[in-house]
């Protein structure tokens, strides 16, 4: 059976490892949040560009006359 000191040291090592893991995961979450914010901004820019585009000269399907074989 392990001594109390060895058990304490093992718990301290596990805790240090978990703290490191939590910090690494936190950094990844921060990066992903920044990426999401950037992508949302890009989507908003694209939406603005699409709304600003001139309407197409091509007729919609409802406006098209059916082909002669109908």
UniProtKB/Swiss-Prot annotation:
Database matches in Pfam families: SlyX (PF04102)
Record family assignment: Belongs to the SlyX family.
Name of the protein described by the UniProt record: Protein SlyX homolog
Organism: Shewanella sp. (strain MR-7)
């Amino acid at each position: 059976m392990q001594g109390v000191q060895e058990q304490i040291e093992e718990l301290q090592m596990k805790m240090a490892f978990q703290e490191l893991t939590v910090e690494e995961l936190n950094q990844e979450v921060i990066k992903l949040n920044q990426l999401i914010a950037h992508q949302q901004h890009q989507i908003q820019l694209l939406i603005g560009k699409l709304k600003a585009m001139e309407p197409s000269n091509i007729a919609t399907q409802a406006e098209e006359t059916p082909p002669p074989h109908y």
